Amino acid sequence: MLRVWNLSLLCATFALTILGTFLTRSGVLDSVHAFTESGIGPAFLLFFALIVGVSVVLIGWRGDRLRAPGRIDSPWSREGAFFGNNLLFAAFAFVVLLGTVFPLLVEAVNGDRISVGVPYFDRMATPIGLALLLLMAVAPVLPWRKASGELLRHRLYWP
């Protein structure tokens, strides 16, 4: 169950670490965390493109062999909560990626220099973080496979 999803998350994580290294080492991103400009930036960008291309091709080509016969029976199960946490973490990563890359895209398209500051990240990350906290609190008490309403009420009832 979820083998293709797990492999996709693994490949995306590795590719995004290479992208982050490119952004900080190439001088494209102006930040207190960025390093001085060096000539290694294009190599990281090429490596990033290679990793993404190979990952997409291999997952597309061999994805049918990775698919397991099982599936998530209910969203109100432990595996459903874990998958929900995965989706929320992926959304959180997308919010951070968008906040990091958006000023670069605007500058490339319009030539305008903009800045995405703390209010954007606070506004976007707070609901995702609260949902993550809720799911992390509820997931351990959910049963595997399927949960009935009565069982959920009993396990989530405050003593």
State where each predicted segment sits.
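Internal alpha-helical transmembrane segments of multi-pass membrane proteins
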Residues: L2-R3
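Aromatic-anchored segments of alpha-helical transmembrane domains
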Residues: A12-F22
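Contiguous transmembrane helix-bundle modules in multi-pass membrane proteins
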Residues: N6, L10, L29-P159
